[in-house]
């Protein structure tokens, strides 16, 4: 089964940045990535895809934040790990994300080496 990663972020450059950093993996079919530019769009994608392997979500988005989205994702897909990716790396935000069910927490600017290790670990667990 192919690893499917959903990236949720309202910033317009996120998709191109992720596709650039993971271009070899994507070309090799190691995993697939889809992108949602809002929490409601992500929730729709979670409903449509029967088995996302990993969700990476920004926290600060207009309308519905990643923290507001997190319990809804966990209710629909309790076994899918969600890693929060945010510019707000303070302890209160980290604690709130963990309490809501986040499997991990990364701060922006994104350390793509660290993110790759997170993805590799998740892929090993599901293999």
What are these regions (language model features)?
Residues 38-41, 65-68:
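Acidic catalytic/metal-coordinating carboxylates
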Residues 108:
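A Lys-centered signature of the CheY-like receiver
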Residues 68, 89-104, 117:
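Alpha4 helix (beta4-alpha4-beta5 surface) of REC/receiver domains from two-component response regulators
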Residues 12-34:
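Two-component/phosphorelay signaling modules centered on CheY-like receiver
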Residues 50-56:
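Active-site beta3 strand of CheY-like receiver
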Residues 111, 120:
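Receiver (REC) domain switch/active-site region of two-component response regulators
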Residues 61:
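Receiver (REC) domain active-site loop signature in two-component systems and cognate sites
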């Amino acid at each position: 089964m192919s690893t499917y990663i959903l990236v949720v972020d309202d910033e317009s450059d996120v998709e191109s940045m992720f596709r650039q950093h993971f271009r070899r993996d994507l070309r090799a079919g190691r995993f697939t990535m889809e992108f949602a530019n809002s929490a409601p769009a992500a929730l729709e994608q979670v409903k449509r895809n029967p088995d996302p392997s990993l969700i990476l979500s920004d926290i600060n988005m207009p309308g519905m934040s990643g923290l507001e989205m997190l319990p809804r994702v966990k209710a629909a897909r309790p076994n899918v790990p969600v890693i929060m990716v945010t510019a707000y790396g303070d302890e209160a935000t980290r604690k709130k994300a963990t309490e809501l069910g986040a499997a991990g927490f990364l701060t922006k600017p994104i350390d793509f080496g660290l993110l790759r290790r997170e993805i590799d670990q998740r892929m090993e667990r599901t293999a």
